[in-house]
Curated annotation (Swiss-Prot):
GO terms for biological process: aerobic respiration; electron transport coupled proton transport. Its cofactor is [4Fe-4S] cluster. PANTHER family: NADH DEHYDROGENASE, NADH DEHYDROGENASE [UBIQUINONE] IRON-SULFUR PROTEIN 7, MITOCHONDRIAL. It is an enzyme of class 7 (translocase). [4Fe-4S] cluster binds at residues 37-38, 102, 131. NDH-1 shuttles electrons from NADH, via FMN and iron-sulfur (Fe-S) centers, to quinones in the respiratory chain. The immediate electron acceptor for the enzyme in this species is believed to be ubiquinone. Couples the redox reaction to proton translocation (for every two electrons transferred, four hydrogen ions are translocated across the cytoplasmic membrane), and thus conserves the redox energy in a proton gradient. It is a peripheral membrane protein. GO terms for molecular function: 4 iron, 4 sulfur cluster binding; iron ion binding; NADH dehydrogenase (ubiquinone) activity; NADH:ubiquinone reductase (non-electrogenic) activity; quinone binding. It catalyses: a quinone + NADH + 5 H(+)(in) = a quinol + NAD(+) + 4 H(+)(out). This is NADH-quinone oxidoreductase subunit B. It comes from Geobacter sp. (strain M21). Binds 1 [4Fe-4S] cluster.
């Protein structure tokens, strides 16, 4: 299974990290978790005018099919265990986007019942400020998430050199 002939003109070499990260960033499947008015702007982002599909971003209704969760709106302390459960059901690797002032910092609701930022419970990768943020802001935030994914280091072990043979695992 090794390379028996020299590389031709139409051959591209790359690292496995780059290839996997390109595939991951080109097919983000977010789980929507709209809790307030930010959810309306999130729905507008998925509509024809902004068309998230052109970026490979397709909303999923099941956490088991999603690799990103967009927390949009006010998170109450009663809702927090549900959000954590949904997050735990998502397969690895997974990313979190906090959309809106309420998800980022609690917004104007400085009360005992509102979580003052979802980052108290989940590791947030991208913050999108605004009340509510415009669809363009969500698009920009998702493109920043794509940039972050493209630069991640994966742990795929050692690389296989050119001309080396792969042996099946025992």
């Amino acid at each position: 299974m090794g390379v028996d002939q020299p590389l031709g003109e139409n051959i591209i070499t790359t690292s496995l990290d780059s290839l996997v990260n390109w595939a991951r960033k080109s097919s983000i499947w977010p789980m929507t978790f709209g809790l307030a008015c930010c959810a309306i702007e999130m729905m507008a982002t998925g509509a024809a005018k902004h068309d998230l599909d052109r970026f490979g971003i397709i909303f999923r209704a099941s956490p088991r099919q999603a690799d990103c969760i967009i927390i949009a709106g006010t998170v109450t302390k009663k809702m927090l265990p549900v959000i954590k459960t949904v997050y735990e059901q998502m397969p690895e690797p997974k990313w979190v986007v906090a959309m809106g002032a309420c998800a980022c910092s609690g917004g104007v609701f400085d009360t005992y019942s509102v979580v003052q930022g979802i980052d108290e419970a989940l590791p947030v990768d991208v913050y999108i400020p605004g009340c509510p943020p415009r669809p363009e802001a969500l698009l920009y935030g998702l493109m920043k998430l794509q940039d972050k994914i493209a630069n991640e280091r994966n742990s795929f072990g050692s690389s296989i050199g050119l001309g080396e043979r792969l042996e099946p695992a025992a």
